[in-house]
């Protein structure tokens, strides 16, 4: 199996390095390539770089960095910039959760989404903290060992979130749906050294829907959550309402 690894924290980030070394040391008879941003590009979502050139830097040992977004990285990695055609894409391990509404902003999930767009089964994995990357690596490894039994095709993305706890404390894996966060906190305002007003985006909101069956609930209770995602934002329930409304309007 040929696996393309990417992330949004950058190619040197501890999460992607932990997963890279775990997979290499355990030798799953897989061919690996790592292509990730040259710096932290968290919350880049599905953005592509269109107005400036992209450059790939070869760091040896099949590790590459790109002066672009996570989506750029996967796009280049699959679409002809490298002599490598992966069987699947894995994005992560992210330092921090990607649950609920986070998936709309997440560069980690976006890298997996690009893999899906380009016809590859894709997985995004995040650690809900920044300490126990070995726990998330082990969860990912167990999935790889059983991948031949996993009915994952290119229309589905698996979004995995792992509690930041030792592996022996993990209770198991739950299949979940996305929860929901409250709105983000207000922006943080301050001044730069020259006295100019500057702003920082506020923290993500707390969980609003963390009921049983959600990713929030699973992680809070010591389980890794696995949420299957699809890319269809259509609000089907509203279609009939809008049809009825527009039928009575003259254009």
UniProtKB/Swiss-Prot annotation:
Cofactor annotation: a divalent metal cation
Q: Name one GO molecular function term.
A: metal ion binding
Lineage per the UniProt record: Bacteria, Pseudomonadati, Pseudomonadota, Gammaproteobacteria, Thiotrichales
Q: Report the PANTHER family cross-referenced here.
A: 5'-NUCLEOTIDASE SURE, 5'_3'-NUCLEOTIDASE SURE
Return the EC number. Answer: 3.1.3.5
Q: How is the cofactor bound?
A: Binds 1 divalent metal cation per subunit.
Q: What is this protein called?
A: 5'-nucleotidase SurE
Residues bound to a divalent metal cation: 8-9, 42, 94
Task: Please provide the record's keywords in A-Z order.
Answer: Cytoplasm, Hydrolase, Metal-binding, Nucleotide-binding
SUPFAM superfamilies per the record? SurE-like
Q: Could you tell me which NCBIfam families the record lists for this protein?
A: PRK00346.1-3, PRK00346.1-4, surE
Question: Where does the UniProt annotation locate this protein?
Answer: Cytoplasm
Q: Which family does it belong to?
A: Belongs to the SurE nucleotidase family.
Cellular component GO terms held in the UniProt record: cytoplasm
The entry's function note states:
Nucleotidase that shows phosphatase activity on nucleoside 5'-monophosphates.
Catalytic activity of the protein: a ribonucleoside 5'-phosphate + H2O = a ribonucleoside + phosphate
Q: Kindly report the protein's main subcellular placement as a broad class.
A: cytoplasm
Identify the gene encoding this protein. Answer: surE
């Amino acid at each position: 199996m040929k696996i393309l690894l990417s992330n949004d924290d950058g190619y040197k980030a501890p999460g992607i390095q932990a997963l890279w070394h775990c997979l290499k040391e355990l030798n799953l008879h897989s061919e690996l390539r790592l292509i990730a941003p040259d710096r932290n590009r968290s919350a880049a979502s599905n953005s592509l770089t269109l107005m400036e050139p992209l450059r790939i830097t070869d760091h040896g040992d099949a590790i590459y960095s790109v002066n672009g977004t996570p989506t750029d990285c996967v796009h280049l990695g699959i679409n002809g910039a490298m002599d490598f055609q992966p069987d699947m894409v894995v994005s992560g391990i992210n330092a921090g959760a990607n649950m609920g509404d986070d998936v709309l902003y997440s560069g980690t999930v976006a890298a997996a989404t690009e893999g899906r767009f380009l016809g590859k089964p894709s997985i995004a994995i995040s650690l809900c903290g920044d300490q126990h990357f070995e726990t998330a690596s082990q969860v990912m490894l167990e999935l790889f060992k059983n991948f031949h039994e996993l009915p994952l095709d290119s229309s589905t993305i698996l979004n995995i979130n792992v509690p930041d706890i030792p592996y022996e404390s993990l209770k198991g894996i739950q299949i979940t749906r996305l929860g929901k966060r409250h709105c983000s906190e207000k922006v943080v305002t301050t001044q730069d050294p020259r006295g100019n007003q500057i702003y920082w985006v506020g923290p993500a909101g707390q969980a609003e829907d963390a009921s049983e069956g959600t990713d929030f609930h699973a992680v809070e209770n010591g389980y890794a959550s696995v949420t299957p995602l699809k890319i269809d934002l259509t609000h089907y329930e509203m279609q009939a309402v809008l049809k009825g409304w527009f039928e009575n309007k003259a254009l």
